[in-house]
């Protein structure tokens, strides 16, 4: 008993010393961590080739564990994002990718959850890199209005940051975004929207009515091909252009769980939420449908994203699938 009291007393003393010195301890930890944090560049760890990472795998429903749709594509020296949902830019930085190194963004469509991180992305790229021109944003017809709106909303901020930091950090020539529109390809056709250094980025029309235009993107580089579906119902077009590819990144929504949410909303008298839950399944693919598309096309790997609803309880992923 006496020995136990001695051990407990020593432990309490150590805890007290640690608490009193917490600022010093934190300073030393930061001194060790900051060089690694600020000096990390994930691109330097990748082999030459075509690479994918998710900086956001969720949809519009709020969740502490999921961000809006955001896909990183690395092709040789090129670094792209497909869509920029909320928190995507911050996750991109947490993954160790250089915000100042982003070459362009490709938008699949203009639903809020796919574009609401654009302003933050443009600001972070501008203020942390050495770019001298705005961030190019490729998208189907209508992208010009979206980009003009973001630039207008952030125009005061551009001035504030330039006045504070000057041209070294925030040159006005690089502030904001610039739209690069393209015509949505006809049904069943591909349109090349970017081609450089052995990389081809092709757009395809997808089925997300009443949302129009809506596209997916196919990236081909170094003998590898991946296709990002964007938001779409199950579609033969996806399967046709995904035939034999290495990776299909496909959105998915669980109609069973959405149905449970609709029934619950009805029981609570929440007609608005019930109507939303009734509406959304008809322009998304289910996990099973996405898997069927991948199987029938002979895809090497399938990666789900735009996971709806968010996975919030243990075991829910099994129900979602």
Language-model segments: what does each one mean?
Residues 2-16, 216, 222-227, 233-321:
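Cap/insert and terminal regions of metallo-dependent hydrolase folds
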């Amino acid at each position: 008993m006496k020995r136990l009291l001695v051990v407990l007393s020593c432990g309490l003393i150590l805890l007290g010393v640690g608490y009193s010195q917490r600022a010093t301890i934190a300073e030393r930890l930061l001194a060790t961590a900051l060089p690694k944090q600020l000096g990390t560049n994930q691109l330097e760890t990748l082999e030459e080739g075509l690479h994918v990472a998710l900086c956001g795998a969720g949809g519009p429903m709020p969740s502490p564990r999921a961000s809006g749709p955001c896909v990183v594509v690395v092709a040789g020296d090129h670094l792209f994002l497909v869509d920029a949902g909320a928190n995507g830019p911050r996750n991109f930085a947490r993954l160790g990718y250089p915000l100042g190194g982003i070459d362009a963004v490709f938008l699949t469509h203009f639903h809020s959850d796919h574009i609401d991180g654009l302003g933050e992305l443009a600001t972070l790229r501008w203020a942390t890199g050495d770019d001298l021109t705005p961030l190019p944003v490729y998208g189907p017809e209508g992208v010009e209005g979206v980009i003009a709106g973001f630039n207008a909303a952030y125009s005061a901020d551009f001035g504030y940051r330039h006045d504070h930091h000057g041209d070294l950090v925030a040159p006005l020539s690089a502030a904001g975004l610039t739209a690069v529109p393209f015509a949505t390809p006809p049904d069943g056709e591909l349109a090349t929207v970017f081609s450089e250094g052995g990389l081809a980025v092709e757009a395809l029309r997808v089925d997300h009515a009443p949302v129009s235009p809506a596209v997916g993107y196919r990236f081909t580089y170094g003998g590898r091909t991946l296709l990002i579906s964007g938001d779409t119902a199950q579609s033969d077009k996806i399967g046709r252009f995904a035939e034999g590819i290495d990776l299909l990144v496909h959105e998915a929504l669980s109609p069973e769980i959405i149905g449970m949410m609709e029934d619950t909303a009805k029981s609570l008298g929440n007609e608005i939420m019930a109507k939303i839950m009734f509406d959304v399944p008809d322009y998304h693919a289910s996990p099973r449908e996405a898997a069927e598309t991948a199987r029938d096309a002979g895809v090497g790997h399938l990666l789900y994203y735009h996971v709806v609803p968010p996975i919030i309880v243990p075991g829910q992923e099994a129900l979602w699938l």
